[in-house]
């Protein structure tokens, strides 16, 4: 029974030592020396069983660097072990120290394994002053897992750097090769212009090409490859106009004069919309500006948006009226041809090759051109709206541009126009057309009298009116351009006055349609025996 009790005591002591030694480092074990005042073994009292550590004899050990405060002549006393330890510090210098190690945990600490961060070796013995003769040596250098990881990362970083450098070299070679190729192709362009004529045979005129595309093509204009070829071959001659969208140049293609509208890059939406409208199926009409080609030209540092159309040397109706007067026949010819163009725009043509209805949205005298035969054609379709009755959708361009305020209808100025329906856009065009007829009528001579050219509302608003200016005059006061008394004394001008008044009515529903205007003017043309 006594032996069983002793074994239980020993097992408890071992568990206690293990639980404490695991949380302690070597230094804490070495500083506790188990110093005693004498070397005698403890005597057991009657009926008392001693622990194993209390029965062990005490040793005298040599101490250096680990001496307790009460050490005498570099000696210390312990019931554990004497030790000697050699350590290497962060600077690589070695230090040899000695001392006493207390009994508890000494067996574990004497088997201390070297750490990767700190190289050291400890040796122990159990006889008096035995550690004076111990000569521990440092363990060999071992590459730990941390150092292994550093090498692996270094290898990875070097590999990545090599790959990046290789990619940069490869990309540079590719870009240089591409640049050289583009330079050579650009050089070949000037030499190979003649080869482009394979698409356009020698002797073919623009009229021939357009007639062929109308009869054998889809009716939406020239093939894109032909358009691009024409755009490349055009020679710019001189600038003939400039506006908020860009510039207009007179150019030449194989000796034929053409108009080249060069859009600012900020007006790409206008260029795209106008090109789209012009290439609508069955869009071509004698009173709509003749579209030839569209292209984007650039070298990387700059971009030009080209729209190539027929060239009309008489310029716009605005320019023409400022320097020319009209007789009644010329007036009717201008008005009727403009009405025909507007009627074609507004009319939807049904069928598999049909045409949607189109509203202009920026009708004014500057956007109507004068042809050689004295008739008109409508231009500048960058703000146009399309409508297809099959889908019942109003196709409004994504464009920040707005129409000209002076020509805006009342419902546009007061923002009451229903943008979800197409008919209001048609009626707004009719209002603008009424103002254009007024501009023409002022320049018509009757009885030797004619007024000087003026813009609508010239005496009511500033030269560059604001929305508020126009809204006050047109919507609030409901004023319209002044009419000369002489108009009532002439049969033709009296009929024209009635027509324009029905065009600029305040209520959109009261305005005439483009077809009605066309038919009314046709009767007047017939009565005046005007040759169209």
From Swiss-Prot:
Chain positions covered by the region annotation Mediates specificity for BMP ligand: 107-109
Ranges per topology, Cytoplasmic: 177-532
Stretches of the chain found on the membrane's Extracellular side: 24-152
Active-site residue numbers: 362
Signal peptide (UniProt feature, chain positions): 1-23
Matches recorded under Pfam families: Activin_recp, Pkinase, TGF_beta_GS
Catalysed conversion reaction: L-threonyl-[receptor-protein] + ATP = O-phospho-L-threonyl-[receptor-protein] + ADP + H(+); L-seryl-[receptor-protein] + ATP = O-phospho-L-seryl-[receptor-protein] + ADP + H(+)
Location in or out of the cell: Cell membrane; Cell surface
UniProt keyword Transit peptide, yes or no: no
Record organism: Mus musculus (Mouse)
Name the UniProt record assigns to this protein: Bone morphogenetic protein receptor type-1A
Tissue localization of expression: Widely expressed.
Domain Protein kinase: 234-525
Function: On ligand binding, forms a receptor complex consisting of two type II and two type I transmembrane serine/threonine kinases. Type II receptors phosphorylate and activate type I receptors which autophosphorylate, then bind and activate SMAD transcriptional regulators. Receptor for BMP2, BMP4, GDF5 and GDF6. Positively regulates chondrocyte differentiation through GDF5 interaction. Mediates induction of adipogenesis by GDF6. May promote the expression of HAMP, potentially via its interaction with BMP2.
């Amino acid at each position: 029974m006594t032996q069983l009790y002793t074994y239980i005591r020993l097992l408890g002591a071992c568990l206690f030592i293990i639980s404490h030694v695991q949380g302690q480092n070597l230094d804490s074990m070495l500083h506790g020396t188990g110093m005693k005042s004498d070397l005698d073994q403890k005597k057991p009292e009657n009926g008392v069983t001693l622990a194993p550590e209390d029965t062990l004899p005490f040793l005298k050990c040599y101490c250096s660097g680990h001496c307790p405060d009460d050490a005498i002549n570099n000696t210390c006393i312990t019931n554990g072990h004497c030790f000697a330890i050699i350590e290497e510090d962060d600077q690589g210098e070695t230090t040899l120290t000695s001392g006493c190690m207390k009994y508890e945990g000494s067996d574990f600490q004497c088997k201390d394994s070297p750490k990767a961060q700190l190289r050291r070796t400890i040796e122990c013995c159990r006889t008096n002053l035995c550690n004076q003769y111990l000569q521990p040596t440092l363990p060999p250098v071992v590459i730990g897992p941390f150092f292994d990881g550093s090498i692996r990362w270094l290898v990875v970083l070097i590999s990545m750097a090599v790959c990046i450098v290789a990619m940069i070299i490869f990309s540079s070679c590719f870009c240089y090769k591409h640049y050289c190729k583009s330079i050579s192709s650009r050089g070949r362009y000037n030499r190979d212009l003649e080869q482009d004529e394979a698409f356009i045979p020698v002797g073919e005129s623009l009229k021939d090409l357009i007639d062929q595309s109308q009869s054998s093509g889809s009716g939406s204009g020239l093939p894109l490859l032909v358009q691009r070829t024409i755009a490349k071959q055009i020679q710019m001659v001189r600038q003939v106009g400039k506006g908020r969208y860009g510039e207009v140049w007179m150019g030449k293609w194989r000796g034929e004069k053409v108009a080249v509208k060069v859009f600012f890059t900020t007006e790409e939406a206008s260029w795209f919309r106008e090109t789209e409208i012009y290439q609508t199926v069955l869009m071509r009409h004698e009173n709509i500006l003749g579209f030839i080609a569209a292209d984007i030209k650039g070298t990387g540092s700059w971009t030009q948006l080209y729209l190539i159309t027929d060239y009309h040397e008489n310029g716009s109706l605005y320019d023409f009226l400022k320097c020319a007067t009209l007789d009644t026949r010329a007036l009717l010819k201008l008005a009727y041809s403009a009405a025909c163009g507007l009627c074609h725009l507004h009319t939807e043509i049904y069928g598999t090759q049909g045409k949607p209805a189109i509203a202009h949205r920026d009708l004014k005298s500057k956007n109507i051109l004068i042809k050689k035969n004295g008739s008109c054609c409508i231009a500048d379709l960058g703000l146009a709206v399309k409508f297809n009755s099959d889908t019942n959708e109003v196709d409004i361009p994504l464009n920040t541009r707005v129409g000209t305020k002076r020509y805006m209808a009342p419902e546009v100025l007061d923002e009451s126009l229903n943008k979800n329906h197409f008919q209001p856009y048609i009626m707004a065009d009719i209002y603008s057309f009424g103002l254009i007829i007024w501009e023409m009528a002022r320049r018509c001579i009757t009885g030797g009298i004619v007024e000087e050219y003026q813009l609508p509302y010239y005496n009511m608003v500033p030269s560059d009116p604001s929305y508020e200016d126009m809204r006050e005059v047109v919507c609030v006061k409901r004023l319209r351009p002044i009419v000369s008394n002489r108009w009532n004394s002439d049969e033709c001008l009296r009929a024209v006055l009635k027509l324009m008044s029905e065009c600029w009515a305040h209520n959109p529903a009261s305005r005439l349609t483009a077809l009605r205007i066309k038919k009314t003017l046709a009767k007047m043309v017939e009565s005046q025996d005007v040759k169209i």
